[in-house]
Amino acid sequence: MNKILLQCDNLCKRYQEGSVQTDVLHNVSFSVGEGEMMAIVGSSGSGKSTLLHLLGGLDTPTSGDVIFNGQPMSKLSSAAKAELRNQKLGFIYQFHHLLPDFTALENVAMPLLIGKKKPAEINSRALEMLKAVGLEHRANHRPSELSGGERQRVAIARALVNNPRLVLADEPTGNLDARNADSIFQLLGELNRLQGTAFLVVTHDLQLAKRMSRQLEMRDGRLTAELSLMGAE
């Protein structure tokens, strides 16, 4: 078994608005190994996106903790969490969230700029990642000049440009047609094999989830089962 990279212990998330209390996550516990490809499957409203926000340090659990590489996130300052997200985690969303006035190359380079890398390193690494996703020839195009599949590939290159140990992906193919969705998942698998990056993908699509090496099911804020989807039709 691979060394545990990320572990969540009894995560709970509760929102309070006036006298109304909403429990979104209930005692969620699981781990992700180094280099693992894992899917969490569930319908809209099951708590998947809230869980990813907690795992990425974008929100704080009501109780429980997230442990990344042996270090509890609850003990990290806001600045330390920001550094962790920049250096060790990558994020891919259903919508690409590319900056519209910047080229593909500039969008991919953004995490390196934030991390204050050297200019020569920034340019070469961003180009390297665009090449890895098959878009080096589109480096100087803005998002409006790219197709939906190309924009999502740029977003993936951006997520991986700092060579993160784990990428958190929230419905990464949700806005794509079947052909582009298939292409994106093939790309994630290839990057996992080449770079050893771990991926945790949340999705409602069983056909896409079955491509991951491990699948968990989430319902009403609870992990209910470990699925066996390999080869499922």
Curated annotation (Swiss-Prot):
Q: Lineage in the entry? A: Bacteria, Pseudomonadati, Pseudomonadota, Gammaproteobacteria, Enterobacterales
Q: Which PROSITE patterns match?
A: ABC_TRANSPORTER_1, ABC_TRANSPORTER_2, LOLD
The function of this protein is: Part of the ABC transporter complex LolCDE involved in the translocation of mature outer membrane-directed lipoproteins, from the inner membrane to the periplasmic chaperone, LolA. Responsible for the formation of the LolA-lipoprotein complex in an ATP-dependent manner.
A GO cellular component annotation in the UniProt record: plasma membrane
Where are the membrane-spanning stretches?
A: none
The gene coding this protein: lolD
Output this protein's name: Lipoprotein-releasing system ATP-binding protein LolD
Q: Where does ATP bind?
A: G42, S43, S44, G45, S46, G47, K48, S49
Q: Which GO terms describe its biological process?
A: lipoprotein localization to outer membrane; protein localization to outer membrane
Entry keyword Ubl conjugation: no
What EC number(s) is this enzyme filed under? 7.6.2.-
